[in-house]
Amino acid sequence: PIRWMVALLNNEVLDIDLEGIKSSNITRGHRFLGEKEFEVNSVEEYFEKLDKNFVVLDQHKRKEMIREQAIEVAKSLGGEVELDEDLLEEITFLVEYPTAFYGEFDEEYVKLPKEVVTTPMKEHQRYFPVSKDGKLLPNFIAVRNGDSNRIDLVKAGNEKVLRARLADALFFYHED
């Protein structure tokens, strides 16, 4: 949903009303990291202030940030990230300020067929699998919308959710 609208032409605010939302030169940064509201008076200032307020506006830059971070995180685990381009695209548009991190899951799951593990990882949780020499590792890479502050809590929460998903997958694999 549209919550506010910035509309400028030659540094002047355009008078636009869209479904009761009036245009202005006031916008906001990242919901948790940026300023609540700030004024912009030009396109250049818009990009500059959003960047300072933890919003990477350029989707191509955001996508490359995610790609590069995921590759580096996987390397730190001694593996390679399985970068599904459709998933990468989806995550790019789910976050404003991406920070990739890794999580772990029980090694018993890597004995299952790869798709049984990677499907809930990718389809339900939006995680990237990590492999080494074509074999799945008991790790995943997730992308947080924010900085690395308290990433340990974010990691623990993501691991907990994936454990439940994988337990379900294991159950259905054995039942079917």
What role is predicted for each listed range?
Residues 1-176:
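Amphipathic alpha-helical "coupling" segments that flank catalytic cores
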